[in-house]
A protein has these predicted regions:
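Bacterial N-terminal signal peptides that target proteins for export
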Residues: 1-9
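C-terminal segment of classical bacterial N-terminal signal peptides
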Residues: 14-22
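Primary mode marks residue(s) on the alpha4-beta5-alpha5 output face of response regulator receiver
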Residues: 26-53, 57-173, 180-252
Length: 252
């Protein structure tokens, strides 16, 4: 089911290695990370199968790859500005229409306490992982903008004429902030890496199916390009999902 011919689905995955979770569970803070490396790996979807995925850009933990585990990531270094942050984030590589790669400049991860004030925000448990984004979230929980503008459903936007500091194309993802409990513990993963988490509302909180309030995460990826409309940008995943044209995506 294709929603738009130029719909570009940005999907971001995260393998979270908690750092001082009790200290940060009810705070707001920002983690700023540089681009780490690029590889055809996905340790969540294709664990222990190097080269099985389309190309991804990796941020944060420098060791992330097909064989990454919770323990291996704890021992690795990070390129983030917060000491002890060993979480990993990755997204499909952004391409120009001529086939060249657009390298991201940096990624910012915004952590904040949960939806409803006064309710406990549970820290992420060890080895927590999830995937966010895709065709069903585009325009609401994910999309593209020029740093502060409204979300667009396509990466083909022009930020070149905007004010200083707002001239870079950005991909934005909001992760689900509600989880499930099983046998007294927070569920850390699911078969599709999505169904163990859900989105909630600032009015009603978390849904009954996923009553555990988790830290809310928003990810902003700033790319080294101002005019993706002229460059005819698309994600490499668009070409792997059966899209009829570059920039058009179908869900996995």
């Amino acid at each position: 089911m294709r929603r738009s011919l130029i719909l570009t689905t940005i999907v971001v995955a995260s393998l979270i290695v908690p750092f001082s979770t009790s200290a940060h569970a009810d705070q707001k803070f920002i983690v700023d990370c540089l681009f780490a490396h690029r590889a055809k790996d996905d340790p969540i979807v294709y664990p222990r199968h190097p080269g099985a995925s389309h190309m991804h850009d990796f941020f944060g933990n420098r060791s992330t790859g097909a064989f990454s585990t919770y323990r291996s990531m704890l021992r690795a270094r990070t390129n983030c500005d917060m000491a002890g942050e060993t979480a990993a984030y990755w997204a499909p590589t952004l391409m120009r229409g001529n086939g060249t790669i657009v390298t991201p400049r940096r990624i910012k991860i915004y952590y904040r306490s949960g939806l409803l004030p006064g309710r406990r925000t549970n820290p992420f448990p060890k080895n927590f992982r999830m995937i966010a984004g895709g065709v069903h979230s585009i325009g609401k929980y994910s999309g593209w903008n020029c740093d502060g503008t409204a979300l667009s459903k396509t990466a083909r936007i022009d930020c070149s004429g905007r004010s200083v500091g707002h001239t870079y194309v950005r991909g934005e993802i909001i992760f689900p902030m509600c989880g499930r409990m099983k046998a007294g513990r927070i569920v850390t993963d699911s078969v599709n890496h999505r169904s163990h988490v859900a989105y909630g509302s600032h009015k009603t909180g978390c849904p009954r199916t996923h009553p555990v309030q988790l830290p809310a995460i928003k990810v902003n990826i700033r790319y080294g390009i101002s005019n993706c409309k002229l460059a005819r940008c698309h994600l490499v995943s668009d070409m792997m999902m059966g899209a009829m044209v570059p920039g058009g995506s179908r869900p996995r």
